[in-house]
Amino acid sequence: MKKILLTILAISLFGCGENKPSQEQKDKADRYVQSLVDADIGIYKGELTDANFLILAVDAYSGANFDAYARTYLEEAQTKGLEIKGVYIVDIKDCQFGDGWVSGDRIGKAFK
């Protein structure tokens, strides 16, 4: 019985593994974000998080439906080959970017 429980525990621990994005996915995300920044459409920065969410920073203004923007960018990112769980939109004035993380209130969101 102990062997069975130990085996199940080991499978659970090793089977769950890390779900961090691959280097290929990070590179695709970087290219996609750079294309959005270069398009001069109000996106100033972006990051693919370790949890596999794409975070885009915009200059937020009242009355905008940022959930709709997030849905649009999620669909577009998926057509570009990104395998992400979703897209979050943050206000560029109230966020911080790090390597694989972003802090700040999510003002728009869309999920796969």
Where in this protein do the model-derived segments appear?
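Bacterial signal peptide processing site
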Residues: 17-19
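Polar/charged, Gly/Pro-rich intrinsically disordered segments
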Residues: 21-67, 82-112
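C-terminal motif of bacterial Sec signal peptides marking the signal peptidase cleavage site
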Residues: 12-15
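Sec-dependent N-terminal signal peptides
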Residues: 7-8
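Long, well-ordered alpha-helical scaffolding segments within enzyme catalytic domains
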Residues: 69-78
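Positively charged n-region of N-terminal signal peptides that target proteins for export
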Residues: 1-4
